[in-house]
Amino acid sequence: MTLPLDLPVPATGQWRLAEVQLANWGTFDGKIYRLPIARRGHLVTGPSGSGKSSLLDAIAAVLTPDKWLRLNQAAQGSGARADQRSLVSYVRGAWSRTVDDDEDRVVSQFLRTGATWSGILLRLESGTTQPVTLARLFFLRAGGSSNADINDVCVLERSAIDLRDVEPFVRKGVEVRKLRPPVPEALGTSGVRIHRRA
């Protein structure tokens, strides 16, 4: 629901988040989800389990180096819930945790159990120049269960790109060399940032 507000349009020239795209991130499963962000601001609200923290964690996963990345900040300080989310749990699509009494352990259920890819794309706009796209693409092989098993690549592009454009180059593994044609001036290899040359 959009509420009418008599606020001035934010000044052009300020870089603002304009769109978030998610593919196979948490319970955002099976297609590319697009969330346009209003230039005046956006309120993220919904019931428990509706994906609010997953969306915010996706944005953080693109903008924050792994060594400082703390997922599920909304639950931090909530004891056991604070450690339930990781890059692997998001790439795999963890949706349930149950207790296995026979083995005396907690077991996660996943939407994606085999080899899988995941993508997060953030498009920023200033209103005066071309958009800037930041993306992080992940591939997790079948059987991979730790963050060390994830291959990922980060993209910085000075134009609007779409997750559809890069999906073929991460669906079966991160293929940086093949990623270059849709992002022609990209540099880098798996595990490092890809930047477009100025």
Locations of regions flagged by a protein language model:
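Extreme N-terminal "head/tail" segments of very large remodeling/mechanoenzyme assemblies
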Residues: M1-H195
